[in-house]
Structure formats: C-alpha cells, structure tokens
Amino acid sequence: MAIQTSNLGYPRIGLQREWKKTLEAFWSNKIDEEQFLTTMKEIRLQHVKVQQEKGIELIPIGDFTYYDHVLDTAYMLGFIPSRFSEFTSYLDVYFAMARGSKDHVASEMTKWFNTNYHYIVPEYEEGLQISLKDNRPLRLYEEAKQELGVDGKPVILGPYTFLKLAKGYTQEQFATILKQLVAPYVQLLSELHAAGAQVIQVDEPIFASLTKEEVQQAKEIYEAIRKEVPNANLLLQTYFDSVEENYEEIITFPVSGIGLDFVHGKEGNLHAISKYGFPADKTLAVGCIDGRNIWRADLDEVLTLFTTLQKQVQTKDFIVQPSCSLLHTPIDKTEETHLSTELFDALAFANQKLEELVLIHSALTKGTESISNELETYRNVHHTIRSSAVRNREDVKAARTALKEEDFSRPLPFEKRYELQQVALELPLLPTTTIGSFPQTTEVRQTRKEWRNGVISNEQYEKFIEKETEKWIRYQEEIGLDVLVHGEFERTDMVEYFGERLAGFSFTKNGWVQSYGSRCVKPPVIYGDVAFINGMTIKETVYAQSLTEKVVKGMLTGPVTILNWSFVRNDIPRKEVSYQIALALRHEIELLESSGIRVIQVDEPALREGMPLKEKDWDAYITWAVQSFLLATSSVANETQIHTHMCYSNFEDIVDAIRALDADVISIETSRSHGEFIDTLKHTTYEKGIGLGVYDIHSPRVPSKDEMYKIVEQSLEVCDPKYFWINPDCGLKTRRTEEVIPALEHMVQAAKDARSLLKTNA
C-alpha cells in the first residue's frame, strides 16, 4: 500500500504579510518591477521550502499568485478583455484586469464558492483567441526543481470550473468554448509532463454541484485531453463539499487519481463510496484535515475514517491531504502566545495542519503506536476545550431557550412602517447615503497603533476619533448627502471590532488570511458562547448625531456575516452560534434606538457566501440565516428604519431570502457586477426600500456623474422611485480622501438630476 502526504495549496501572504507589502509597494511605485519580481520569487520559494521541511511529499506548485489564481488562469488562456489591449507588459495587463485603471473598469470580483476569498471573474468576448499565452505552471515547476531540488505537484484550475466561473458567453456557446479549451490544456499538460511532473493536480471544485448532463459534458472534455496526453498523471481534485450525486460517473473519468473532501463532504462521499466503491487503478486523495478552519483535527476520527475507507475501496494507493487549499487559514500559530493555554492548544494553522498530515501518515504506515504520545495530547486538548466554562454558559443557554415566535418579526408590515418612517425622517425622494466607512488614512492607522501600544492615552485617542468624525460629518453635509454615517474610524475591521466587544471571541495577533488582492483580514475566533457585555457603538454614533441636524445611521455588522467571517467553534451547529450573536446584537440595537438613533444599518454582506454549494441544502441555511437577522432587528419601533447591505453575491439565488429579511432598506453592490442585480429585478419584484450601488469603490478611479446617472436610470426602470436609495457599492475605508469626495459629489449630483427628471415627468 502506497500512502503519500500532499498539500493542495499554501497561504500566499507570507508569515509577516510580506506578499501584501510587496504588492502595495509596487503599486505605489516604491519598488520597481525587478525588485517586485525578485521579492515575490523569494516568498514563493520560501513557501515551498517550508512545506518541504514539514515533510510534505507532494508540494503544490503554481498555487502562488500575484493577485488571484483564477486571474492567473484567465491570463494564461488569453481571456483578456479588449479594453485592456492598450497595455503591453504582462504586469500592466494583469493588474489592470484586477484593479482597473484611470480609464478602464476592472473585471468583476466575486466570492470563491462559499468562502470569504474573492476571485476575478474571467471575461469571454466574441472573437477571443483562446490559446496557451503563458505556461506559468511550467515555469514555476522548473523554478522549484532548479532552485530547491523539489519535484513539485503543479496545481491548475480545471477547464470546466474555469469556464463555469467565467462570464460573457451565452449558454448556447458554452459547449463550443469548452471544446476550444482542450487545445491549450493539452499543451499545458503535455509540457508539464515532458518536464517531468509526476503528479498534476487539476482543481474542479464546481464538480460538487453539477447536473448529470454537466458531468457528462466535463467527462468528454477530460477524455479529449487524455487522448492527447495519455501518460500524464492527473489528480482530479474536488473540495468544499461531496460529489455524491455524480460520484458513480466521476470515478470513471480518465484520470490517475481523485481527491475528495472528507471534512465538508464527509457524509456524502462516504455514502457514495459505500455504494459504488473506488477503482483499484486510481489513487484516492483523502481530504481529512479541515483546510477552512483553525482547530486541531480529531486524529482518532481521521484514523477511523481511513480504517473505513481501506475496507470499502479497491485501491491501495492513498494520499493524505487537507480538505482544500490552506489559503483559507493563517500560516502559523507560534506567535499567538498571548492566547489562553486551552485555546492556543486547540488551534492548528497551516503549518500545524501540515504537521498533522505527517502524523496521520506515520500512524497509517507505521501503526498508531508511532504517534501514541501525540494521540494522548490531542485527546486531552479536545476534552479541555469542550468542557471549558466559556463553552457552557447557563445565561446564554437560558436566553436561547426563552425565544418565542414573536421575537422574529417586526410589529407592522413594511408598507405601514415605511410610511411612519417617512414622516419621522423627512427624507427627499431618492435619498443619498454611503455604506458606512470612510478612508482609514495612514494617520488613522498610525494613531490607532500608537494607542494600542500605549504611546498615547485613551483620552487622546478618543479626541482624535472625535476630530475625524466631525471632519467627515462636515464633508458629508457639504457634499449634500441625506443620511450620514460617523465613518467608523475607531474600527479596524467590521467583524473584529464587534468580536472584541462580545464574550466568546478571541483574537490572534498574526492570524491573517487573504480576502482579495492584497487585502488581508484577521478573522476573530469564536471559541465560546457569545454574549453581550457593554455598548459597542453607542458613544461614537451618538456623538456623530450630536454634530448635525441630519440623520446619522448606526452601523452594525449582522450575525450571519460575523459568523461567516470568523473562525467558528466546531462543537455546536453554526445556527446556534448565529443565534447567540443575534441576541447580543439585539441588545445593542435596542440601546442605539433608546439613544435617539433612528436609522440602524445591520450589514449582511456574507449572507450569500455561507450558502451550501448544493441547492438541496439551501433552504435549511437560508431559514436560520434569515431568522438570525430578524432576531437581531425585530425589537425596534416601527418608526426606526432598519437598513442592511450586501456585496459580491449571486443575488438571483437569494432574492426571496433578501425579501424575507424584512429590512426597510437594502443596499446592494451593482456597478462592479455590471448591473446583474438590475437584470434580476427585471424578472421579479422587490417591494421594499433598495439602493443599488452606483459606483465601484474597489477601484481607485473616480467615476463621472453620467456613469452613475446611467445606473440610477437603469435601476429606476425596475425599482419604485418611492423606495429607491442612491449609494456607492460598498464602504469607502480603503479609498483615499481625494478619491472619495469627488465621487460622492458626482453621486449626489446624479441623484439631483434624477429627482429633477422624475418631477418633470410626474
């Protein structure tokens, strides 16, 4: 029996976020291209070296990127939109596609399946010449071989998933374009095989949610590829869920091995294997360590899994690997010594997960006695955290038990509430607002750092925050916005801020993961029962409201987003954790309302991303996600207006869920997705307050008034002007002041023009 250790992908960002810093230095012209490429190579090779030293046998090559692996694939295959044709160098084209430029909008960005990672959406255009423009995986494979002597495992995004994630073609064109991908993939794989690649990992995460017809279509493509590259050792890799529905067909694909997720798809994949077995002539790559969470594995459970598999499958060849790329986990926990011992011991970041793979390999090849000490340690760690007082609070349990049906609904229906709110708030037609945050300048970040390091006092820091808040209240008044925000200068991150003020959360010092491009986030760790402690946003919001006669919105992050953007305890259902968060937020919302705040926004940008990949599992998730939002927001008076915000989602899947949230106003990203939600509203109705984002805040370019007016015009074709709001796509935290002010001025002018037109046509 042959058993190997493997990894599917390693975090890109560097132990001290060297990758992020290098990218941003290059973008701001602080380093030149040569220095950029040299530093990136050093980081890339260091990651390979770490995995080599940890004892991983099949080390992924090509998972490293300058921005996004889907964008890498798009560039490699020639999926380059014509609007970027004026750029000549690779990096200029690449980063223009990712970030846009002064004159060109970026390609769309959206969530990578149900994770908090974002990918750049490939664009197909008529007349596109699909070819292998650049065999990047080959270059990186040869680099690792020459520089480190590592015969790595090239990782590529599979043709079917790639094209399914792309946009710009009709369904009728899909099959034709898919066939056009065969030639470049054949060339790519042929060259890798000729260079000596022993195993080539082909990622097809979309296989977890395909129809039988689609699987057959994908199989034909793999048969066409295999015909031309008969000797390449292809490992077909799936993850994020099981392939149960199509397992019987997938195991007949002409590949040498198949990777399955036995963490997030354990039940389905095991059921399929028990029914259909597994081919003797293929390698089974077992995703047995959670690549999306930060907890130590249950080694006993993993070894039991292998015992079950060895009884049920015909193959003798296994690969021990994570459930997915470790892109979604921080790199190393060794710096987190500030954490309690019980929590620190329970954690496993990427490097620790690699060590777990080696432990499992040892147990499988040498017997469990070879890791008997480690097994005992793991059992003790799991017992300690499970029985901890922070996970067994009686007050939290009592609050959950006491919930009644009326806790999940507003007293009056939307139409009647909105009438009362219009009287109370006295807002104009097509009111303007922003999504919440304003620029976190170098001064803001530096002052916060000084405060956290004890260089300045609490009083000095609070004075600084008040000064920034007042400055931006005045800016908003001058610009002419209708509903203002305090700017969130006191907040580092929209989830971390609340987690720091709620019981049950803990925070890492260096637990960074990539969200999109160079943007990294440090998710909170929900390790215990969540409960309210003290007011979290009252002071700053009430201060901002005291500065102006205009309405100021309270700003909170919703329970489902806090859940989905955190590393969550895995000993109770996610629904229960979400309800705990909702109850804590409910208390905060009641305090805001009693302090005179009449508009309260509860953001849920991550509602869609938490949905299971399989449609059959959607209803159960949506039910408790919506109930969580309602639990947080339903205790306010009818006159209090509840807003919510969403971005980067496939909204057509959740229109009914959005409606069920019963928010008085929802603001939704529209501009970067090129108006897709506007198209969705052409086929359905939305009868509540809605703001469709009129400009993309993730690009540095300042859009013209006319661009925004066009989106307003398109939106009003499908939205009732009585309920329509005008706002940017998202918060403005990452933008510069000189970008924000003119953009908002253009937005307000577009709103005024639209109001004038509506009055003229009335």
From Swiss-Prot:
Binding residue positions for Zn(2+): H645, C647, E669, C730
SUPFAM superfamilies, per the entry: UROD/MetE-like
Cofactor(s) listed in the protein's UniProt record: Zn(2+)
Record-annotated active site: H698 (proton donor)
Catalysis performed (reactions): 5-methyltetrahydropteroyltri-L-glutamate + L-homocysteine = tetrahydropteroyltri-L-glutamate + L-methionine
Cofactor: record remark: Binds 1 zinc ion per subunit.
Binding site residues for L-methionine: I435, G436, S437, E488, D603
Residues binding 5-methyltetrahydropteroyltri-L-glutamate, per UniProt: R17, E18, W19, K20, K111, R519, C520, W565, E609
Similarity remark: Belongs to the vitamin-B12 independent methionine synthase family.
Protein name as catalogued: 5-methyltetrahydropteroyltriglutamate--homocysteine methyltransferase
Organism (species): Bacillus cereus (strain G9842)
Origin organism lineage: Bacteria, Bacillati, Bacillota, Bacilli, Bacillales
